[in-house]
Amino acid sequence: MHRRRSRSCREDQKPVMDDQRDLISNNEQLPMLGRRPGAPESKCSRGALYTGFSILVTLLLAGQATTAYFLYQQQGRLDKLTVTSQNLQLENLRMKLPKPPKPVSKMRMATPLLMQALPMGALPQGPMQNATKYGNMTEDHVMHLLQNADPLKVYPPLKGSFPENLRHLKNTMETIDWKVFESWMHHWLLFEMSRHSLEQKPTDAPPKVLTKCQEEVSHIPAVHPGSFRPKCDENGNYLPLQCYGSIGYCWCVFPNGTEVPNTRSRGHHNCSESLELEDPSSGLGVTKQDLGPVPM
């Protein structure tokens, strides 16, 4: 009986134990079931993050490459714009330069009104300059030429030193005109530097001009047997008494070498009296007594 009771008790307890096992197994499986869906979700979020970061980096690199290409393409256009701007500036400077006057026939055909007489009130008022007072210097000729081309052109009075005049011109001229003037001065300086060498060459003294007496003496040697050699004073004029040593004849002459008539003879003469009687301007033997008294 006791065995039967114990067996029945075991059979009654068996379903209870099975239920407990099922509960334990279910409790163990519930956390695992809660964990299984979380693992793939975390993996998907990491993959999406990596993908988004790589796409962002790719877009940044592509943007930088596009910007560099755009700047490279625009560089050529900027160079063309710079060249065009420089050409326009040069053309503007060229238009500012003074132009030569047109022929009268062309001016009549193009603008006939310019040939009509203008009233005096319409002319610009300014300091009038006397265009007839010109010297023989280079600037005088240039001034005369410019006045003929444009009689109404007014030139500032430049009476200071050279640096002061340049400063005055820089302060009074317009910017474009001063730039043109600076360019001209630059080319003029290059021309002067190329024309003159840096080494100062010693300048030779100009040859001394010989008088008639000195020239005759230079052609005759000091020892001159049988030839006439005139005598000159310190100024190069002929001495009043000239002698031919080989034949012994002497005569009187004027300072220019003209012989006084009727003075040739042997021996020495007093040429001062002969020169007073003769007219030194002619040298042809005409005496002052023959000319008569000089009218007062």
Swiss-Prot record:
Tissue: Detected in urine (at protein level).
InterPro entries according to UniProt: CD74_antigen (IPR043530), MHC-II_Gamma/Thyroglobulin (IPR052001), MHC_II-assoc_invar/CLIP_MHC-bd (IPR015386), MHC_II-assoc_invar_chain (IPR022339), MHC_II-assoc_invariant_trimer (IPR011988), MHCII_invariant_trimer_sf (IPR036613), Thyroglobulin_1 (IPR000716), Thyroglobulin_1_sf (IPR036857)
Pfam families with a match to the protein in the record: MHC2-interact, MHCassoc_trimer, Thyroglobulin_1
PTM comment: O-glycosylated with core 1 or possibly core 8 glycans. Contains chondroitin sulfate.
Modified residue annotations for Phosphoserine: S25
Residue(s) at site: Breakpoint for translocation to form a CD74-ROS1 fusion protein: K208, V209
Domain Thyroglobulin type-1, chain residue ranges per copy: 210-271
Entry keyword set: Adaptive immunity, Cell membrane, Chaperone, Disulfide bond, Endoplasmic reticulum, Endosome, Glycoprotein, Golgi apparatus, Immunity, Lysosome, Membrane, Phosphoprotein, Proteoglycan, Secreted, Signal-anchor, Transmembrane, Transmembrane helix
Protein name according to UniProt: HLA class II histocompatibility antigen gamma chain
Source organism of the structure: Homo sapiens
